[in-house]
From Swiss-Prot:
This is Elongation factor 4. Its EC number is 3.6.5.n1. It catalyses: GTP + H2O = GDP + phosphate + H(+). It is a peripheral membrane protein. It is found in: Cell inner membrane. The gene is lepA. It comes from Chromobacterium violaceum (strain ATCC 12472 / DSM 30191 / JCM 1249 / CCUG 213 / NBRC 12614 / NCIMB 9131 / NCTC 9757 / MK). NCBIfam families: lepA, small_GTP.
Amino acid sequence: MKNIRNFSIIAHIDHGKSTLADRFIQFCGGLELREMSAQVLDSMDIEKERGITIKAQTAALQYKARDGQVYNLNLIDTPGHVDFSYEVSRSLSACEGALLVVDASQGVEAQTVANCYTAIDLGVEVVPVLNKIDLPAADPERISQEIEDIIGIEAVEAVRASAKSGIGIEDILEEVVNKIPPPKGDPDGPLKALIVDSWFDNYVGVVMLVRVIDGSLKPKDKIKFMATGAEHLCEQVGVFTPKSVQRPSLNAGEVGFVIAGIKELKSAKVGDTITLVSKPATEALPGFKDVQSQVFAGLYPVESHDYEALRDALEKLQLNDASLKYEPEVSQALGFGFRCGFLGLLHLEIVQERLEREFDMDLITTAPTVNYEVVMKDGTVEVVSNPSRMPEAGKYDELREPIITSTILVPQDYVGSVMTLCNQKRGVQRNMQYMGRQVMLTYDLPMNEVVMDFFDKLKSTSRGYASLDYEFKEFQSADLVKLDVLVNGEKVDALSLIVHRASSVYRGRELVAKMRELIPRQMFDIAVQAAIGGHIIARETVKALRKNVLAKCYGGDITRKKKLLEKQKAGKKRMKQVGNVEIPQEAFLAILQVGDK
């Protein structure tokens, strides 16, 4: 066991984590040259394209160190994005050490700080590495000072490397061997193995990525999951080099995969503990929790007969992504669809994109919302995530909205504008620290405001330099109202919003003005109104057309006419009938563009 090293890489998006992993694999001969592809560990196309890592992956590498011994290095790749923070904490708790990779030209970012603190809390040894040292803009002296100022770990001796050109790769591996402690565990005790990740394979069912803490596991063992109590027969175990290689057993301290013929991911939850039925462990490993959805949105097929196909697609996605939740819902405006729960906005975007790309779905997405707690007159508390399900104004005592604690790292020049933005979003400042050239702001913000467009605005006010990390804090009572949109006197449920009373009139006016631009003119006047309860607060009118001007095709080629007709047909397909007015897809997205004052 003393020659095993388990480590992961902590880095902000785009600081070169996956490229570094590729170099390790190449250096240790994990794959032959012809099998190398850029970003070997990012297996989804969308991961490669956006340059982000979503699922954790591993590689078991053999490294012959300068002291002549051969070490088994287990690299566990972690996602770097704030939406996937639970997956990160599980990956880190499977390791004894972590490489903190920082871009030598960009410096430390908020998500790096958050993940690094997670690592330190879990007692993981953090080894700093400065990457992209060959860039003309690299300034290693300043950045190592920044690491010390912000995170507070020694960084003077940080390895300087460039994953792209392969500089300093061996030095990093030496650091891993020398600085990171070997795993501790009892090889003969009862089996305890942590599920770091799990995914679905079409041939063998669920594949679990585990880190064995105590004991050992071999095929034909009967295993038990401690959180769910389910029992299964272990069929095969092995390691990834990144290709999968079967092994006769997995022992204490090792990281590998377990296949046990499990049909669905729900049974193999990330963070759960596996033990043997014959010799069970007394208590599970700490830190397991069920992941809760934070952001909700409605997904509707453009064509109503695609409903079944959308359900199948969501089921398949859920096989690989246990944090995606969905339930059927009906909207008067959009027909049948699903209400889906996500970890955050990035997660929502990724799911939407995968549905469109991998399953070829045409979707209409409603504006994202969050969970609200409604305290009814009789004292019961209901959780509502869909504005159109919100009870009438007189039926409840108070409304509570989720508050998050956000940490924003921003260069000093932009502090003023970022603070103004946070105040506009009803934020409460909790803390402010100067660290070198950066400032760390801590704010309590209503999640409702963050979901809308906070991230984009934060990036634009700080010219892209600010970075954000957040976690849920509590539900807090607030003066919120439900804003309805009426088109021709009929409520359009998919356009309902929950807003703060102070900004409701402004939001209503803006939304109605936007809708007026987007609703095509008909043969009659259309009234577009915004209402709170029975009280109309804003109105715009879409003026009627005088006559139809489709008379420009006199003679001419039939294909030309066909083309125009086809084009019109495609446009019609994307629109949905509401009463007697067609509302285009853009109108449902208009909610997102309605800013605050």
